[in-house]
Amino acid sequence: MARKAKAAKKSDNGAKVGFEDTLWLAADKLRNNLDAAEYKHVVLGLIFLKYISDAFEERHQELLAEVEQGADPEDPDEYLAENIFWVPPEARWSALQANAKQPTIGKKVDDAMVAIERDNKRLKGVLPKDYGRPALDKQRLGELIDLIGTIGLGDKENRSKDILGRVYEYFLSQFASAEGKKGGQF
């Protein structure tokens, strides 16, 4: 166990950051009757949403502390100036996690993706929006949202270490293995 924890901390040299295996096991368990080619979009979309929500929330807290100096935490330009996507209230991770146990969680995630694309033109047409489909078990989707919610992805420290890129790389290799393909063949 100590050796495993030690290996997980070696994140500055490109090694695993420590939580990918946990996420992968959850994703694999939660995927239910979907194959890896379909489920990768579900998982990677949620990871991206958590990443931008974390970055947004960190900047939001900074702006709240600077209100007396004229900062406006509800002005999207305050975020864009720092290369952070604006995340509308209904699309913030906290709102999704608060509804993770609801049978409508799939629709709420779809609506969050639509809202993010609406307010961030650079993301228009890019985000997955099929979380409400019947084949996706909503209870398991909620469990995955809760699990991803325990991991900090988009704060400044993790952004500087390219955590998102490393998590995506890890997941793509795992999805490729699950499909019996080599990485890059998606």
Give the label of every model feature segment.
Residues 1-186:
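Non-catalytic, mostly N-terminal accessory regions of nucleic-acid modification and defense proteins
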